């Protein structure tokens, strides 16, 4: 794992193609792109067939249009998402804001985990519909249907690896933040700084005051 925030080098460095293509998430994304491309290409290419008695096209998976739509949809979205995150990986080290890096890594983690689940559902769905398909309904496109099922199965693991790598990057960023965080709470064992003692000055009588005469020695005026 590279040093820096969230598994990437510190911002400001130049783009290094060799280091970029050697990153585990980049290699896994390229594999995921190829797998997704094969899946939706097989469905778009030979996933819809027609019988001799009709010109209407049907999905090769037990004539279930939802199966073809689901497989092609997750394949196309997986391909586009992989391309997007490849661009993010290329410019990730140029992002200086740690908060932006965190949100990108979290987005990668959530999307990869979701697509791992969707590929699992797609594999089970396509396998179930293919098992229920009548042999007479599949004159062509059988190999493409099997290929779509096979590479859907492989996509489960590739996206699972991407989710695991994203989690490791997120955890590395959180750990780095905790290590560099300084608690502003003062140490209770540290004595408080004593305030400077107030200097006692000699009291001075304020001006413009009259001394109060005491009644001691008072004599009344003479009476005539």
UniProtKB/Swiss-Prot annotation:
Any one GO biological process: protein targeting
Modified-residue entries (Phosphoserine), positions: 3
Keywords for this protein: Acetylation, Cytoplasmic vesicle, Membrane, Phosphoprotein, Synapse, Transmembrane, Transmembrane helix
Family: Belongs to the synaptogyrin family.
GO CC entries: membrane; neuromuscular junction; synaptic vesicle; synaptic vesicle membrane
Described purpose of this protein according to its UniProt entry: May play a role in regulated exocytosis. In neuronal cells, modulates the localization of synaptophysin/SYP into synaptic-like microvesicles and may therefore play a role in the formation and/or the maturation of this vesicles. May also play a role in GLUT4 storage and transport to the plasma membrane.
Top-rank taxon, per record: Eukaryota
Spans traversing the lipid bilayer: 30-50, 73-93, 105-125, 147-167
Name of the protein: Synaptogyrin-2
Topological category with respect to the lipid bilayer: Multi-pass membrane protein
Gene designation: Syngr2
Limits of the MARVEL domain: 20-171
Modified residues (N-acetylmethionine): 1
Tissue and organ expression note: Ubiquitously expressed with lower expression in brain (at protein level).
InterPro entries recorded: Marvel (IPR008253), Synaptogyrin (IPR016579)
Keyword Acetylation: yes
Signal peptide range: none
Protein localization: Cytoplasmic vesicle membrane; Cytoplasmic vesicle, Secretory vesicle, Synaptic vesicle membrane
Pfam families given in the database record: MARVEL
Post-translational modification remark: May be tyrosine phosphorylated by Src.
Acetylation keyword on record: yes
